[in-house]
Amino acid sequence: MGAGATNGELAGRVSDAGGLGVVGASFVPPDEIRTMIHEAREITEKPIGVNLLLFATEELLDLVLTEEPEVLSTAWAREDQDLGGIFARAHDSGAKVMHMVPTLAEAHRAASAGADIIVAQGTDGGGHVGLIGTLVIVRQVTKAVAPVPVLGAGGFADGAGLAAALALGAQGILLGTRFVATEEAPVPDYYKQAIVESDGQNTVLTTVSDSLTGRDWPGAWARVARTRFIEEWLGREPELRRRRAEIWAKLEQTDERGDADQSIMWFGQSAGLIDSIQPAGEVVRQIAAEAEEIMRSQRSHGE
């Protein structure tokens, strides 16, 4: 997850339960980044990660590495960025590098640059994604970059998804939407409830949110909830850019009112698999237990 949907408590609880909690550091003030990392450290002694969107926030790299996270999570590098140099700086600090890719070409680039883990992200996911389905991109990448470990991302929310990713050759999964719908996630209650109530069909790939923020993501669309606000601005992105300040002010009022249908909510199709808001640690343990039971059952049927 990126900035705004994570905090130190969420990352700490995920790691403490046996996952890898990741703090989103992009577009976050330096002092807040340090605070989130320290909050996670107060909860757990287990490894944590910090995520940077390289196209926009490479300048934060030194600050993040000074805090000595066990894992540097990266994504969305520009073509002109030196991934090998960035990854080498992380390795020199003692961190492992986990890089997310939406295409096979980017997977090869990350592997050549020295990534320790590659996250193959499918278009099913929430937030900024590529255009290849999760099933295909995960299998493509696991075959192409072996023996580099691969995680699947986009559309995963339960133990069955984890078992499926393992069957595709991945070593695990990265979850975004599932952890937004947790007690610790620092988003409004209406946002979490919208995920729980979603059937997975009410999302859309769009550039509306980027037109509003003014950020140009390299080769990405954003999957968001198809709210009335999004419907209103689909196809009107140039006007939205011109009226950015005015519309931002209205959205801030929406947050205060808790009006989900006049907001932007980044979540993926896995929302259709989520039916409750739970503690993050409970989510981690439940997914692991479900996957173990599924794989145990499959082994027994094969005997």
Go through the PLM ranges and name each one.
Residues L131-L151, A157-E303:
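Conserved active-site-proximal phosphate/metal-binding subdomains
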Residues M100, G154-G155:
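Conserved acidic functional residues
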